[in-house]
Amino acid sequence: MSWLKEVIGTEKAVIAMCHLRALPGDPSFDAQLGMNWVIDKAWDDLMALQNGGVDAVMFSNEFSLPYLTKVRPETTAAMARIIGQLMSDIRIPFGVNVLWDPVASFDLAMATGAKFIREIFTGAYASDFGVWDTNVGETIRHQHRIGAGEVKTLFNIVPEAAVYLGNRDICSIAKSTVFNNHPDALCVSGLTAGTRTDSALLKRVKETVPDTVVLANTGVCLENVEEQLSIADGCVTATTFKKDGVFANFVDQARVSQFMEKVHHIRR
């Protein structure tokens, strides 16, 4: 039995993303609509996800495009306010993801009581955001310095819109990441949000680290969820839950329910 059962309540867990709209300081933030509108839309999406039956939810600043690798304090503060106002209505385990800043994610997790975070913790990359370097040693020390040792860590080892600097095979990356960092899970992704995770790649990673939770991190949908969950220990998904399966849209509860009905059938 993996920690998914203990923390989320089931194996083959479905972690649904609650994508927060652009926040103060983001280029797309609408100051006329303001934070109350962002909170209202987050509540709508949260309700649709929970009522549709997902196992857990993860809040992320998905519309803070283009992303920073070290976020400004107003981003974390805005996310803390949103989650704080939603707290009384959160009925399932939740995590947070401050894109793309693992230190800020730990800070937000401690402020809100989140059970897990997902981030790019390791590696150096050429990315759409410039040369992207990480400092996992300092990040994990920060985790323990602030008392966040119980927060589960989901290591994304195939970062979106980026390529590893250096010719390293994904299996080598998976193996050394597990050895050096003891992650609670590895996330395997496609190129961008909503892009399908390659099943062959997912299989190679899971076979390399069979004792570590491996999650399909992008592009899981009604058509491929059975195949993906036959390999992975669970999935993180968002786009397929949105109206017409379009990233920019809001969550459609009917799509969530249909997806989860299939997942329950797979779990039997």
Swiss-Prot record:
Classification via Pfam families: BtpA
InterPro entries tied to this protein: BtpA, RibuloseP-bd_barrel
SUPFAM superfamilies reported in the protein's UniProt record: Ribulose-phoshate binding barrel (SSF51366)
Family: Belongs to the BtpA family.
Stated name of the protein: Putative sgc region protein SgcQ
Native organism: Escherichia coli (strain K12)
Classification lineage: Bacteria, Pseudomonadati, Pseudomonadota, Gammaproteobacteria, Enterobacterales
